[in-house]
Each structure stands twice: as structure tokens, then as C-alpha cells.
């Protein structure tokens, strides 16, 4: 609980409750070797029942994690396999000076580089918005492209990600705060 490195903390802290009723948070102060200087702050937090996830929150987190695993397995574009394919197909639109803090936009473009990795998709657009605000970002290089939220997320457990949008005419992406969104462009 609140240990930044619980690898060697043992089963007391790292136990798995397959019933989904408890996740171990608040079980006790983390080991002194790396954490004793923070115990005065950590102690009251660990005693606060409001900070312990409910069984419903644990189930929601599990379902959302399973959606991410399904996304990872949904297209071979997430496992290009060679340096050459990565260099050919992967770009980061909107990156660089002036890019919004806490945001990563990654485009895996299967129309580039000759070899068609996924016949079903022309591209995958991954947006990681770790900021506390909804991201609305024009990406001029994506004007005219037809990106839609992946069916896995559109039909998945996370209701927040469904507010993700892409405007084809302006190339503008909109992603809620603290959200990872995966958009796809079907093959033409």
C-alpha cells in the first residue's frame, strides 16, 4: 500500500483476491527501507476507507484492463515486429514544441512502408491523455482521414472513453481527461 516498489513486499501486500472484494490497499504501512520517511503522510491515507476501492470499482478496473488486452490483440499493427516496420509506420502527430503536456498521440499508419500488416485497417491512432483536462487537438496531418473509436472501446466497459471524437474535416481529436483512446481507420 503506497509502496512505489512492492516487488519484494511479499504476499501480505501483493496477495490477489480473485473474488474481487478487496485489493489489499490499506493493509499496512509499506516497508521501512524505502518508505519510512513518508509514513507520517501514508499512515492517515491508508486508514481512510474512502480511498479503498469498492468491489464495484475493482470489477470496473478489471473490465477496463481486459478491454485494453483485447485492444492489444485486435490488430497486428500493435506488434510490428521489426525496426524497419516501426520506422516506416509509426509517427507521433502533434509532438514537439508546443505539444500539450501529459498527452501522447501515436499513429500506426499501415498505408506507409509498402507491406500491408493488417488488411482490415489502414491505421490505428492511440491517444494517451494523462492530463486532467479534455484534450481537443487539431492534427493537420490527419485531415480527411476517417478515424472512429475502436469497436472494443465503443462497446467496452469504460463509459468515459466513449466521449472520444474525431472530426475528419479539421483533423481534430477530442479525448476526455485521464483516458487512453484507440481509434481505427478501416481499410479503403
Language model features: what each stretch is:
Residues 1-125, 130-145:
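Loop/helix patches that line or flank the sugar-binding groove of alpha-linked glycan CAZymes
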Residues 109, 140, 150-152, 176:
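A structural detector for beta-sheet-dominated domains
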Residues 164-188:
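C-terminal beta-strand-rich structural cap/linker in extracellular carbohydrate-active enzymes
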Residues 157-159, 180-181:
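A short acidic, often aromatic-flanked loop/helix-cap motif at beta-alpha or helix-coil junctions
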Residues 142-158:
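Solvent-exposed beta-hairpin/edge-strand motifs
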Residues 125-128, 150-151, 182-184:
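Conserved active-site loop/cleft motifs that coordinate metal ions or position small ligands
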Amino acid at each position: 500500500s503506497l509502496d512505489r516498489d512492492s516487488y519484494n513486499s511479499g504476499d501480505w501486500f501483493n496477495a490477489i483476491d480473485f473474488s474481487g472484494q478487496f485489493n489489499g490497499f490499506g493493509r499496512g504501512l509499506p516497508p521501512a527501507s524505502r518508505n519510512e520517511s513518508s509514513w507520517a503522510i501514508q499512515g492517515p491515507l491508508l486508514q481512510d476507507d474512502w480511498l479503498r476501492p469498492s468491489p464495484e470499482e475493482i470489477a470496473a478496473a478489471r473490465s477496463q484492463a481486459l478491454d485494453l488486452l483485447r485492444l492489444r490483440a485486435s490488430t497486428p499493427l500493435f506488434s510490428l515486429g521489426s525496426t524497419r516496420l516501426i520506422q516506416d509506420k509509426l509517427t507521433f502527430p502533434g509532438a514537439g514544441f508546443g505539444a500539450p503536456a501529459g498527452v501522447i498521440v501515436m499513429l500506426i499508419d499501415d498505408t506507409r512502408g509498402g507491406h500491408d500488416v493488417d488488411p482490415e485497417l489502414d491505421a490505428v491512432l492511440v491517444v494517451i491523455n494523462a492530463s486532467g483536462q479534455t484534450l481537443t487537438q487539431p492534427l493537420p496531418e490527419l485531415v480527411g482521414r476517417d478515424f472512429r473509436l475502436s469497436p472494443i472501446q465503443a462497446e467496452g466497459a469504460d463509459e468515459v472513453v466513449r466521449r472520444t471524437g474525431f472530426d475528419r474535416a479539421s483533423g481534430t481529436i477530442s479525448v476526455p481527461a485521464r483516458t487512453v483512446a484507440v481509434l481505427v481507420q478501416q481499410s479503403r
